[in-house]
């Protein structure tokens, strides 16, 4: 597989991960708004899938660095993909935290 194909695969994996995180965040916000504990549970269950996507990108990136030794724009692009995946993984974790707060009653708070 060529360097270009490996970088394209990283981009595709990042896109898939971004879609998972977006679905998770939207689900967490909706669960919180609707006080839907079932939806919150579904969001928390998706976290492992997001973590797996991050680990795949991380492993593929290190393999790319070791075998292809990209330079210039290829190096910048592949490193940006790795950093973006880290931030997406963190957003996935934050959606889990939102999901965990869904069952909490906020009746003691007043507007």
Segments the model singles out, each with a brief description of its role:
Residues 60-87:
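Hydrophobic/aromatic-rich structural module bridging two neighboring secondary-structure elements via a short loop
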């Amino acid at each position: 597989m060529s360097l270009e194909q490996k970088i394209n695969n990283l981009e595709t994996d990042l896109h898939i991960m971004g879609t998972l995180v977006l679905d998770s965040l939207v689900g967490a916000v909706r669960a919180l708004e609707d006080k839907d504990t079932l939806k919150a549970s579904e969001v928390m269950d998706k976290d492992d899938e997001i973590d797996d996507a991050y680990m795949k990108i991380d492993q593929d990136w290190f393999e790319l660095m070791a075998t292809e030794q990209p330079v210039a724009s290829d190096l910048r692009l592949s490193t940006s993909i790795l950093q973006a995946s880290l931030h997406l993984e963190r957003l996935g974790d934050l959606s889990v935290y939102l999901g965990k707060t869904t069952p909490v009653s906020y009746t003691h708070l007043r507007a």
